Structures are given as structure tokens and as C-alpha cells.
């Protein structure tokens, strides 16, 4: 697409050092026939490890990868349209909620190109109000949630429901998340009023959440300090994944239709509760995360290509007559 940058182009982010042992471990999928990919990277993530590390791994394995930066690119949408030879096998997106990247991803999907994650799954996860209802309707343990178009409406929540956690409906990376202990405290908060808000009952915790990361077909559990307890003495580390946590993470993936995702969970007296669902998180502390993600990207491309081939094979054959129709002369 116009002004996209090849993976071999200069980047201000440090290039991922390729781990030969990891290439051997994941090479069965990574070292396949070359794929053509376009990563859409929002400005906030241009200098982050992810998704640049995935780009580096794919490029080192012989795949062609372009990086499209919406913050500085005029995208020619007509280049997305089908031709005899598709320009890309897939578009991959790491986006912010209010960024332009998702519109470009949806445009690619409208042209029939594979998107990772599926553009509909990203929409579900990005709108936190929709995500809460989707999860609850599917039986995923999720806190009761209130939606308000502005903060002054939150005073309609009964005082008995406090303390609350208040956060933006389109938030990400746990930014602008507040614990509110009383209606009076709510009135004193300097809340960004540019978008809608969610409120949920505060779930007591020991100062940390557990992030469950799914880079493909595996689940990793990482202890992370809670944004509601910034001063807590927490050792951030990988912990064993119990059958309950693995089942919960995979259930979320199925319900939302995500291939690459993470969820924030907290343990309560009634069991684990999901606090948030994120498409393409940072995958911090996941071993060989970039290689696992690269493998998943290529597997999704294969899966979608096979599904399209099966659909074509199952489609009824339309036979057209080659005979010249006979036109009767009018009397």
C-alpha cells in the first residue's frame, strides 16, 4: 500500500535478535513457503517490542512483511481489491481503541483478505460494554457492569454497590482506571469525559492480577501488579497454568473468536473472574513470544486458505449452455 515500509527498512525500534534455537523449535511452521503480510502498526506501538519483534522473526524466515503506519500514511484502498495475484495473504493489526488501524483492517476484510485477529473479534473486545455482555451471556464469569455516557450519571449507582472500579469504555493498557470508594469520592475524580465510562464492583485482591496470554494454542499465566495497587510489593513472574485457568482462557478465545489475545483475571471467593479481554496484548514474560505469534499468524493464513478452498469445492457447479438460442420469427 502507499508509503508502507518494508520490513527491511530502517526502524527506530531495536531489531529483534534472532534466536537460532527458537527457529529450530518453531521452524516446522515458520520455514514454510513465503507468505506476504502487512502489519498495521499504530503510532503508540511503533517503538515497542510488539509487534515489531514478530515482523523481524517472519522476515528472518523468508516471509515478505510490509509495515503500514496509519499515523503517517495515505492508504490506497483500491490496492486492497482482489486481483489475479493477491498483494497480501493477511493483514495483522495491533491497535489502540480509537486509532484508525481497525478501519483499515475492516477494509481489507471487505476485500476478502485474511485479518489477524478477525476484525469482528477485535470489535467485540475493543468495546468494553459489548465485551462484558458477550462474556456474561456466554457464561464467562464477569463482574456486574454499568454503562454511563458521562461520569455524573454514575451517582445513580446505589451506594451499597461501592467500592467501584471506573474505567473508559474504549480503554486499553489499564489506563485511566480508578477505584472509587464512595459517591463523594466519585465527584472529586478528574475523569476524562471524551468518551463513555464503565463501572464495576471492586474485586478485592492481594495487589496483583493474573494475565492469561494466548499467543496461539498455548496459555501462559503471568502475575502483574494491579493498576489499582501501584505501591504493592509484587513479584511479577510466570506461574503454572491450572486446568481451571486454561479452560477459562480458551473459553474466552472461543466466545470472542480471537486467535491472539490476553485476559486479566482475579481470584475471588467464588473462583476466577475475568476483568478484561485484550486482542494482541504485549505478551510480556511469555517465552519466545515473537516466535509463537509468528507461528500463529502463519497457521491462521493456512487455515483460512484451506477454508476458502473447501468453500469453492463445495459450491455448486454452474453449467452454461454453449448452444445458440433459437429465436422464433414473429408472425
Segments (PLM) and residue ranges:
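Extreme N-terminal starter segment of soluble prokaryotic enzymes
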Residues: 33-38
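Conserved N-proximal alpha/beta basic substrate-recognition cap immediately N-terminal to
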Residues: 42-144
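A short beta-strand motif that forms the metal-chelation/ATP-contact edge
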Residues: 90, 212-214, 221, 271-285
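Rossmann-like NAD(P)H-binding beta-loop-alpha module
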Residues: 143-162
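Protein kinase-like catalytic core scaffold
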Residues: 164, 198, 220-221, 261, ...
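A long amphipathic alpha-helix within ATP-dependent nucleotide-binding catalytic cores
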Residues: 229-274, 278, 286, 292-322, ...
Amino acid at each position: 500500500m502507499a508509503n508502507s515500509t518494508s520490513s527491511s527498512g530502517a526502524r527506530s525500534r531495536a531489531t529483534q535478535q534472532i534466536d537460532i534455537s527458537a527457529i529450530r523449535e518453531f521452524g516446522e511452521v515458520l520455514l514454510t513457503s513465503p507468505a506476504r503480510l502487512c502489519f498495521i502498526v499504530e503510532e503508540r506501538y511503533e517503538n515497542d517490542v510488539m509487534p515489531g519483534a514478530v515482523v523481524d522473526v517472519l522476515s528472518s524466515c523468508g516471509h515478505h512483511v510490509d509495515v503500514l503506519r496509519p499515523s503517517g500514511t495515505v492508504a490506497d484502498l483500491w490496492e486492497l481489491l482482489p486481483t489475479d495475484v493477491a498483494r497480501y495473504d493477511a493483514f495483522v493489526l495491533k491497535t489502540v481503541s480509537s486509532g484508525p488501524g481497525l478501519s483499515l483492517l475492516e477494509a481489507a476484510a471487505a476485500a476478502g483478505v485474511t485479518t489477524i485477529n478477525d476484525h469482528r473479534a477485535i470489535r467485540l473486545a475493543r468495546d468494553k460494554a459489548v465485551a462484558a455482555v458477550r462474556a456474561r451471556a456466554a457464561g464467562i464469569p464477569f463482574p456486574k457492569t454499568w454503562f454511563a455516557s458521562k461520569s455524573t450519571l454514575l451517582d445513580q449507582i446505589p451506594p451499597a454497590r461501592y467500592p467501584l472500579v471506573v474505567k473508559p469504555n474504549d480503554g486499553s493498557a489499564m489506563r485511566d482506571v480508578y477505584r472509587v470508594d464512595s459517591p463523594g469520592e466519585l465527584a472529586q475524580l478528574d475523569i476524562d469525559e471524551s468518551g463513555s465510562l464503565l463501572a464495576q464492583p471492586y474485586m478485592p485482591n492481594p495487589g496483583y492480577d493474573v494475565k492469561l496470554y494466548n499467543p496461539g494454542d498455548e496459555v501462559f499465566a503471568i502475575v502483574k501488579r494491579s493498576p489499582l495497587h501501584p505501591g504493592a510489593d509484587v513479584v511479577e513472574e510466570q506461574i503454572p497454568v491450572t486446568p481451571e485457568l486454561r479452560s477459562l482462557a480458551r473459553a474466552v478465545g472461543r466466545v470472542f473468536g480471537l486467535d491472539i489475545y490476553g485476559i486479566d483475571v482475579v481470584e475471588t471467593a467464588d473462583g476466577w473472574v475475568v476483568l478484561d479481554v485484550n486482542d494482541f496484548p504485549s505478551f510480556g514474560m511469555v517465552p519466545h513470544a515473537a516466535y509463537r505469534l509468528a507461528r500463529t499468524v502463519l497457521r491462521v493464513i493456512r487455515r483460512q486458505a484451506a477454508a476458502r478452498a473447501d468453500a469453492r469445492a463445495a459450491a455448486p457447479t454452474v453449467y452454461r449452455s454453449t448452444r445458440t438460442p433459437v429465436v422464433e420469427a414473429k408472425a
